[in-house]
Amino acid sequence: MERHTTLGEFIIENQKDFPYAKGELSALLSSIRLAGKVVNQQINKAGLAEILGKAGKENVQGESQAKLDVLANEIFVSTLRNRGEICGLASEELEDYLVFDEEMHKNAEYIVLIDPLDGSSNIDVDITVGTIFSIYRRISKKGTPATLEDFLQPGINQVAAGYLIYGTSTILVYTTGNGVNGFTFDPGIGSFFLSHSDIKFPKKGNTYSVNEGNYVHFPQGIKKYIKWVQELNEEENRPFTSRYTGSLVADFHRNMLLGGIYLYPQGTTAPKGKLRLLYECNPMAFLAEQAGGKATDGSRRIMELQPQELHERAPFICGNKEMVEKAEEFMQ
């Protein structure tokens, strides 16, 4: 019987490739893995445990929170707080960042930004959802409380990023800047096993993911690009196929494996875009670039944008490098 590498083994084996290898990052990734397993368990029994539906609250963006949004956030916060690898955490679900100032956190080198449950509007109808995370080294002095400056770093400073996808199977995908690897959860054993090694975007793609219900609000360049992908051209394998679920993790994962582009541009109803730069755009951009793809706001590299606030939004175009560059041509 073929033996598969577990996520824990893979993290330890590849720790030497990380420039600051001391073990803390490996332990932090293990903590995220643990929290993801708990969230996955809650999602699988959500209908029976009466944790579907809305929580009756709004997050900082004014969006209605699902009960599982709140629960997933609590699980990640409590799991990471109970370990000593980070000095602070910022979540899409919380207005301000959290400072972990207990004794075990005083010398922690890392901070985490997280979207605990991406695509949660889909949860009640059993469509794939996910968790997105991003890890940075702190800027502030060790031994002092985390500061806002620690969180407002450009994406190029990320030391690790990834996502968990809770679908027909549960998969954890992450990068530390040395390629992208995916691990599938075996519920019978309770472990993640390497299933997608050194993931790369296919050179060509023919899928586009965009909410065409917002077409009337899009800038002219995006409208022209959408018309272009829908035109018949056998040499260029057009028209492309439209696939959009409303779950960034699900759409990104499919496009990275099969080839495609994801677009959530600015528009008249969302002049700065809708996706959050720190919690969604930066980690997905890091993964995309490590998989040979590209991520832009239409003209600028996503990971070079300097955040000004925790919940800043940005236009987001991400996928096969060739497809993204073609979309950029229409945006000029």
From Swiss-Prot:
BP-aspect Gene Ontology terms: fructose 1,6-bisphosphate metabolic process; fructose 6-phosphate metabolic process; fructose metabolic process; gluconeogenesis; sucrose biosynthetic process
Q: What class of enzyme is it?
A: hydrolase
Gene Ontology cellular-component terms for this entry are: cytosol
> Its annotated pathway?
Carbohydrate biosynthesis; gluconeogenesis
* InterPro entries to which the protein is assigned, alphabetical: FBPase_C_dom, FBPase_class-1, FBPase_N, FBPtase, Fructose_bisphosphatase_AS
**Cofactor: binding comment:** Binds 2 magnesium ions per subunit.
Name where it's found: Cytoplasm
Give the E.C. number(s). Answer: 3.1.3.11
Question: What are the GO MF terms of this UniProt record?
Answer: fructose 1,6-bisphosphate 1-phosphatase activity; magnesium ion binding
Q: At which positions is substrate bound?
A: 118-121, 211, 244, 262-264, 274
Coiled-coil residues: none
Enumerate the catalysed reactions. Answer: beta-D-fructose 1,6-bisphosphate + H2O = beta-D-fructose 6-phosphate + phosphate
- Known SUPFAM superfamilies for this protein? Carbohydrate phosphatase
In which broad location class does this protein mainly occur, judging by the first location in its UniProt entry? cytoplasm
Cofactor(s) listed:
Mg(2+)
Provide the binding site for Mg(2+) 2.
Answer: 115, 118, 280
Q: Which HAMAP family does the record match to this protein?
A: FBPase_class1 (MF_01855)
Family stated for the protein in its record: Belongs to the FBPase class 1 family.
Q: How does it assemble?
A: Homotetramer.
Q: What is this protein called?
A: Fructose-1,6-bisphosphatase class 1 1
| Organism of this sequence | Christiangramia forsetii (strain DSM 17595 / CGMCC 1.15422 / KT0803)
